[in-house]
A protein has these predicted regions:
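Short, small-residue-biased leader/transition segments that mark boundaries at the very start
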Residues: 1-5
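Membrane-embedded hairpin module used as a gating/binding unit in multi-pass transport
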Residues: 6-81
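Extended hydrophobic packing segments that form well-structured cores
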Residues: 165-215
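Short, ordered loop/turn segments at secondary-structure junctions
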Residues: 78, 111-113, 166-167, 205
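C-terminal catalytic subdomain
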Residues: 83-162
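Structural motif
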Residues: 71-76, 107, 201-202
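A short, acidic, amphipathic alpha-helical segment used as a generic capping/interface helix at domain edges
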Residues: 53-62, 91-95, 144-153, 181-193
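Solvent-exposed alpha-helices and their adjacent loops that cap or buttress functional pockets
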Residues: 19-23, 64-68, 98-100, 153-156, ...
Length: 215
């Protein structure tokens, strides 16, 4: 949200569709859902104009303005299945990352009953525990699952991530997370990084809502 129109991959996709649209009649049908998978709104019509209107609506619904980044962000994935494993939990990491200061702490609440969710993710983190190394390997040999390892470690360059989860502690460590049993323990650990005077931001639907810094 916010800068979708400035992203190279997005621009390439739009350019590709424009080329296709020169030779074909196209009609777009976009449906926007809420957290319960119910329809919020439907957009239809010209493939690009309808898409732009849908993007504006999504930003209004799921974009949450914030005045400044917080020292500590506490984000819940929003329950099952959004927190079924680390693979899915990474979406909440992405969104909460937008709301935290450099060097801050993000506390993620996620059950992760199915573990990491990807053997390729585990393997990539075991072999290349830095985003630069993972990126270099992906450029040589892109593997689904390993790309999540890059996404996770890239975010960890900015903030400390503490996981409140039923995930096995050894597996959490292998996946580069600090893991604790409850929020109280997470807050005590967070104080090691940000001290005792800090601002907290709560994200009860971390996988859906996107913090947008007010200009």
């Amino acid at each position: 949200l916010g800068d979708v129109y400035k992203r190279q991959v997005y621009d390439d996709q739009v350019e590709g569709v424009r080329l296709f649209a020169k030779e074909h009649k196209m009609f777009l049908f976009h449906s926007i859902l809420d957290a319960q998978k119910q329809f919020l709104k439907v957009f239809a019509g010209d493939w690009y104009e309808a898409h732009l209107e849908a993007c504006k609506f999504v930003e209004q619904v799921y974009g949450v303005p914030i005045s400044e980044p917080a020292d500590v962000v506490i984000a819940s994935c929003g329950g099952y299945p959004k927190d079924i494993n680390i693979y899915q939990l990474q979406k909440t990491m992405d969104n909460s990352w937008c709301a935290v200061k450099d060097g801050g702490v993000i506390i993620i609440l996620g059950e992760c009953e199915e573990g990491s969710g990807s053997a390729a993710l585990e393997k990539a983190l075991e072999e290349n525990p830095s985003p630069d190394a993972i990126k270099a390997e992906l450029e040589k040999n892109f593997v689904i699952g390993a790309h999540k390892a890059f996404a996770i470690t890239r975010l960890m360059k900015k903030a400390h991530f503490i996981l409140v989860s039923a995930l096995d502690k050894e597996l959490a460590k292998k996946l580069l997370f600090e893991s604790v049993d409850d929020v109280d323990a997470a807050m005590k650990l967070a104080e090691k990084y940000v001290g005792k005077d800090y601002k907290v931001l709560l994200m009860p639907q971390g996988s859906l809502t996107v913090p947008v810094l007010k200009k």
